[in-house]
Design a protein with these regions (language model features):
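RNA pseudouridine synthases
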Residues: 1-155
Length: 155
């Protein structure tokens, strides 16, 4: 089953385009393009609208899109994770030294992404690895991981 993301925004001025409203909320052009291809992705008063639609003050734009497919090529591996903060949009993780961030040649099953894949599999939640910042393998420090496409765009 797809993970569906829904948001609603209210236009504050007349004449603002749907695309301008979405861009002001942090949506990237690629995410907006994905939403345009989603059935009932952009709706105002129950009617499908295009990104060029000019809104009136008080119009409520309902945005719906399916989250990307899980990062199925990342093998889930149980490993200790130091999660310092988590909400519905992001996680802050204290990355240990000698742990690569993502799988690579010679590191297919010992990366932070592998540990997060296991973490989300245990919670039966979809997982797409979206590291916002990077740290070298030898470096310890805080990593921000976005939990969805919109928070990834904004961060």
């Amino acid at each position: 089953m797809d993970h569906i993301i829904r948001h609603s925004y209210t236009a504050s001025t007349d004449g603002q385009s749907v695309e301008a409203l979405l861009r002001s909320q942090g949506y990237s052009k690629s995410l907006i393009n994905r939403i345009k291809l989603t059935e009932d992705g952009l709706m105002i008063r129950g009617a499908k609208v295009y990104t060029t639609f000019r809104m009136k003050a008080g119009d409520r734009l309902d945005v719906t899109f399916a989250e990307e497919a899980s990062s199925e090529n990342i093998v889930p591996v149980h490993m200790p994770l130091s999660i310092l903060y988590a909400d519905e949009d992001l996680m802050v993780i204290n990355k240990a030294a000698n742990v690569p961030i993502h799988p690579s040649q010679g590191n297919f099953s010992n990366s932070l992404a592998n540990g997060l894949a296991w973490y989300f599999k245990q919670k039966q939640k979809p997982f797409v690895f979206r590291a916002i910042n990077r740290l070298d393998r030898d470096t310890t420090g805080l990593m921000i991981v976005a939990k969805n496409a919109l928070s990834s765009c904004i961060l």
